[in-house]
Structure formats: C-alpha cells, structure tokens
A protein has these predicted regions:
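N-terminal leader/linker segments that initiate helical-solenoid repeat arrays
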Residues: 1-37, 45-55, 59, 63-66, ...
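A generic tandem-repeat structural signature
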Residues: 45-128, 132-141
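Gram-negative and organellar
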Residues: 7, 65, 70, 99, ...
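An N-terminal domain-start capping segment
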Residues: 15, 49, 83, 87, ...
Length: 665
C-alpha cells in the first residue's frame, strides 16, 4: 500500500481515493485500507462520507486511538468545531502528550476563535515534536487569526506584535507580510505600508501583488498620478505565466487608477471590455458602479450594486458601495440599512464603521457659539455674539434655531446701537433631492432715540434638479444692522434669491447668485454674482477662478448706505482648504481665500480691490471644534456702507450627543 501512502503524503487525494477503493474491493475488511480511504475522502472534500467510515471503524475497534484521531479530524473537515472540541478534550485526557491530539485541539480552538488557548496547545504540541512543520504552520495561521481579531477590535499594536512573531517562525512569509501591510493601511500608517509592500515585491513572483498594493497606497496618500504610474507598470508586467486571479486584480487596480485620475473615458472603455470578457462578474460590476459614483450617475451605480448583491448577498463592495451611492442620492435610511448590513457580514469593518459615523455626524444635534469683532475705515466698530443649533428628529426632519446679539458704534458721530435677532424653524426633506428650510423670528433694534421690532425670515427650497447641479430658491427678510446709522434708519430688506451651482467631471465649476431686494424706504436692488473656477487639487482642495459682481439700486442715498446706480467688480481668486469634516481628532484644519481685481462705481475710474479670508481650526475630538477666522476687504459691496472692512472671530462647535437622537433609542 506504499503507493497509496505516497499519494496521501503528496496531496494527491483523488488518486489516493481511487487506489484504496480498489484495495478494499480485494480486502474489504482491511483496517488500514479503510482508514486511508476515509482520509482520502475527507481530504478530497467528502468529509461526511469519511466520518461515516470512521464511525463504522470505531464500532469494530472502539479503543483504537488512531481511528479516534481520524474521526476527530473528520469533525474539523465538516466544520463541526464544537463537537470536535469536546472530542479532542477527551482524547487528551486519554493521552495528554499525543502530538496529533494536541495539534488537532489547537486547530479546533483556532476555528472557534479561542486563539489564546489555541496558542497554548500548539506550543504544547511543539514541545512534544520540536520544529514540526505542520505545527509551526498551524501556529502561523493561529497568529494570523488572532491578529485579525485584534484588528477588528481596533488594537493594531497587539495585532502587529503577533504578526511580527510570525516572521520569526517563517522569515519573509508573504501572507504575514501582507497582513502586516494591511494593518498599517487600516491604521493609516501609509509609509510603513509602502515599505512592507516593497519588501513583498523583492520576490519576482510577488512583484505584481506588490505593485497593485503600492498603487492603492499612493491613492490613499492622495498621490493619484503616482498610483496610475505604478498601475501602468503593473499592467506591463503581466505575462502568460500570470495567474488568472492576479491578472484580474491587476486589471481591476488599473481601472481604479484611471477613475481616481478622472480619466473616465479610458476607464469606461476598459470596463466595457472587461464586462465583455467577464460578464456579470462582481469585480467588474463594482468597477462600473464606482465609475458611475465618481461621475455622479448614482442611479446607475445603485443598479450595479443591486446586481452584485443578487450574485452575492455578502459582498462587501456591494453592500458598502450601495450605502455610499444611496447616501449621495439622499436616501439616508436605506443608506444606513445597507451599511449596517455590511457589518453583519464583516464585523467591526473599519470602512463600514467610519461610514456610519460620518452619516451619523450629519444628523447629530449641535450648538455653535461664535463671537466676532469688526471695524472699518469709517470709524465703525461692532461686536457680535451668535449661537446656532440644529436638532434632527429623523433623517428628514430637524429643528433649527439661532440667536444673534450685536453692538455697534461710531467713534466719529458718537452713535451707538444694539440689535437682537432670534429665529426658529424647521428643515424637512420633501423628496430625496428636495429640501425645504424655513426660519421665522424677531429682530429687535435699539438706538439712542428709538426702539424697533421687525419680523425676520429665512425660507429656502434646496433642490438637485439634475446630476452635478444644485438650485436654491429663497426668501430672506432682514434688518440692515451693519452700523449704528443704518440701525437708526430701521431699513427692512425683502430678498428674493436664486443660487445655482454646476460641477463637471472635468474639474470646472460654476456658481451664480441673483438677489432682487425691496426695502421699506422704497428702494430696490438687483445683485448678480457669478464665479467660474477650476479645481486644481483634491487634497488639500485647491481651486482658482474669476468672479464678477454687478449691483444696481433704484435710488441713490450715499449719505445713508452704499447704493450706486451701477457697480461692477471683477476679480481673480484662489482658495485652499482642508475641510473640518474630513479632519481627524487632534488635527488642524484651515482655509485661505485671496482675491484681487478691480471695481467700477458708477462712472468713476476703476479702483483696485483685494480680499483675504482665512480660518484656522483644531478638532479636539469628534464632538468639539474650535475655529479662529478673519477677513479683510476693500470691495465696496463687502459692506452696506461701502467701507474697507476687517473682521476677526472665534467659533466653537459642540455636538450635544454622540450620535443622532433618533438612533439612540
């Protein structure tokens, strides 16, 4: 039977199965042949038949320890781990130093995720048989499983400690190195991840795996051009010896790199070709869905994610990708469900957890307290104190409120005034792409000679009529409270406004605003502002462009407020921003806008203008953010009075709850 033993030892289980089956035709009661036949069946994927054979053998030879060991192992083949655990425990009571029993028990505990105990018994097995390759291999996989458990619980240091121990057992082991790199990726230690992937790539057979991973690291570092360069290199490295799975991974990464670099036409052609080559394959459908998200074709993206989930309900890309597309489309409840479904299959998966956290943040109640000091070259100065708050009762409905106290004075005229504005209202999502916001309140103004009370309002309808477009229709009723002289005039403005923005898939953007204003002093105003800009960088966000503004008043009352019959301003600007919403805890964020141009006031000669706006903030935690901001401008339209204007302020934002009110119940 030596030929059959060789088949088993070399992993040729089908040949072993056939060999021992033929032996049993001649010798049907041969114990060794039956035992080996059972092993061949089990190792070839027929675990249940193997178990039946071992049970029959145990009925004839109830004290045979080798048969008991094979029966215990067959329980592992059938993934009956709890039963295997109890059985191996009994075997170890019978023979505490049995190497196969210790090894089998350790593997059983590992499958049940009792990794600490599994390590204890694998070490006992290695004491019994020092340096045994099977035991060392089992220890490697126990460490990998244990490390993954630590990763799921967010303990990356403990995970790395275990993985580095693996490298002591198997120097430069590729699986271990890949897991180490993955921990660095998850913990955003991209430099160490990059170094680890480069180590993996030293071996020629792992070069493609290394390049594909290095392209991803470059993307995560915000270096998309480098990612495409690396991925292009990987495509050129493909040969006829490349395995099918690695070939697919490389093509997938190249398509992703094209998408990251906004080369949508090339990506689309490649994905169509892949779809013809691999019809209805999830990895290709995921690429197409991802491309459509980048192009804001969210409905098409959702359709592809649904096809993915039809093929595989547990798909990570399908569940979390769909959640992302639903969120972008305004279907927030469905987005929550899809993200939570991801966590059912991938416990504590970091991307899914972070997605839900970000979605929660959109609906978590908060309060913003703000104070500012401003002055101009007309001897006006003002102190302003403001508080605003939002409280969401659902993904559709939220309460809004604000209070503003402002004092203003003029050192030349001696005029002083104060104003108090209180507004309260609601925001309601009517449809997935339409939201109504309405605030109504009271403005109380007090000068040295009079007190005024006026109704104020802020009502707007925000829509997304087409992809990459936003449209706002609004009405605002407000009091001119820039300085004491204006407050004394008790000028009420009724503003009817339209805001329209258009983004494109080729980095160009356009924003236009129109105001038509009527005032209780019988004056009217028309204001048009338009901005054409180009997005130069994504991280940090950097854009530059040109602005144009036109203002005209029906009546000119320059002694009271800036009210030209015609006013035109042109400027070029750049804006750089690190958004507070993407900033991590204990990190800084910032924004700087600088602009320069010319303004034409009625028939006067052109005047040079400048505008600087900046802010610097720090995120102490996910719940508290402090921001210092300032601005300076000599553009006449920057203030109601047409003066050069400077403002500095401090803003503190605090999230009252840790998560949305409607998700705490």
């Amino acid at each position: 039977m030596n030929e059959g033993f060789t088949y088993l030892e070399t992993g040729k289980y089908k040949q072993a199965e056939t060999f021992f089956e033929n032996i049993l035709i001649t010798y049907p009661k041969n114990k060794t042949a039956k035992l080996c036949y059972g092993r061949a069946l089990g190792l070839n994927g027929n675990g249940e038949r193997a178990t039946t054979i071992f049970i029959n053998l145990l009925e004839r030879y109830p004290q045979d320890f080798e048969i008991k060991l094979n029966y215990a192992e067959s329980l592992l083949w059938n993934e009956n781990y709890n039963k295997a655990k109890d059985y191996y425990k009994n075997l170890l009571e019978e023979k505490p130093n049995s190497f196969p029993a210790l090894l089998g028990y350790a593997n059983t505990l590992s499958n049940l995720k009792f990794f600490n105990e599994a390590l204890e018994f694998i070490d006992k097995a290695l004491l019994t048989s020092p340096g045994n390759l099977n035991a060392l291999t089992s220890k490697k996989y126990i460490n990998l499983g244990y490390a993954n458990q630590y990763v799921q619980n967010g303990d990356y240091k403990a995970a790395l400690k275990l993985l580095l121990k693996n490298l002591q057992l198997f120097k430069k082991d590729i699986e271990t190195l890949q897991n180490i790199a993955n921990v660095y990726l998850i913990s955003s230690d991209f430099s160490k991840a990059e170094a680890t992937y480069k180590t993996i790539g030293i071996s020629p057979q792992n070069k493609l795996t290394s390049l594909n991973s290095l392209a991803l690291v470059s993307h995560l570092k915000g270096k998309n051009k480098k990612a495409l360069e690396i991925s292009s290199k990987a495509i050129n490295y493909i040969s006829n010896k490349t395995s099918e799975s690695l070939l697919q991974q490389t093509k997938e990464r190249y398509a992703q790199a094209l998408i990251w670099n906004r080369k949508y036409k090339k990506a689309d052609i490649l994905i169509q070709k892949l779809n013809n080559e691999y019809p209805n394959k999830n990895w290709v459908l995921s690429l197409r869905a991802s491309l459509n998200i980048y192009k804001s074709n969210f409905e098409k993206s959702i359709n592809d994610y649904n096809r993915i989930l039809k093929n595989d309900t547990t798909s990570f890309d399908g569940n979390l990708g769909k959640a992302n597309a639903l969120k972008a489309s305004g279907y927030f409840i469905e987005s929550y469900k899809s993200a939570e479904n991801t966590l059912k299959f991938y416990k504590n998966q970091k991307d899914a957890v972070n997605f839900i956290k970000k979605l929660d943040k959109s609906f978590t109640p908060f309060v913003v307290a703000e104070s500012s000091y401003s002055f101009d070259n007309g001897n006006n100065k003002a102190y302003s104190y403001k508080a605003t708050s939002e409280f969401s009762f659902s993904t559709k409905f939220k309460l809004l409120g604000s209070y503003n106290y402002r004092t203003t004075s003029n050192s030349l005229s001696g005029l002083k005034a104060t104003s108090n504005n209180v507004l309260g209202g609601v925001s309601y999502q009517l449809l997935h792409n339409i939201k109504l916001k309405s605030l109504i309140g009271l403005a109380s103004s007090k000068t040295e000679t009079n007190t005024f009370n006026q109704l104020v309002a802020d009502i707007s309808l925000l829509t997304k009529p087409f992809k990459l477009q936003n449209l706002e229709l609004g009405y605002k009723r407000e009091i001119q409270n820039f300085n004491a002289a204006l407050l004394a005039e008790n000028i009420v403005q009724n503003n009817y406004l339209i805001n329209y923005s258009l983004n494109t898939n080729f980095r160009l953007g356009w924003f236009t605003q129109y105001y038509y204003t009527t005032q209780n002093d019988k004056n009217t105003r028309n204001l048009i502002f338009t901005s054409l800009y180009y997005n130069i960088l994504e991280k940090p966000s950097l854009k530059a462009g040109v602005n144009y503004q036109n203002i005209s008043f029906k009546n000119q009352v320059p002694t009271i407020y800036f009210s030209p019959s015609k006013f035109n301003a042109y400027e070029v600007f750049f804006n750089i921003i690190k958004d507070e919403n993407i900033t991590k805890e204990n990190e800084w964020f910032y924004e700087l806008t600088a602009a320069s141009g010319f303004q034409y006031i009625e028939n006067s000669k052109k005047q040079r203008t400048y505008r600087i706006q900046s802010k610097l903030g720090y995120k102490f935690s996910e719940r508290s953010i402090l921001t210092l901001y300032g601005s300076k401008s000599n553009i006449a339209s920057a203030t109601a009075a047409g003066f050069t204007f400077t403002e500095i302020g401090l803003r503190f934002k605090w999230f009252i709850l840790r998560k949305p009110f409607f998700r705490k119940r």
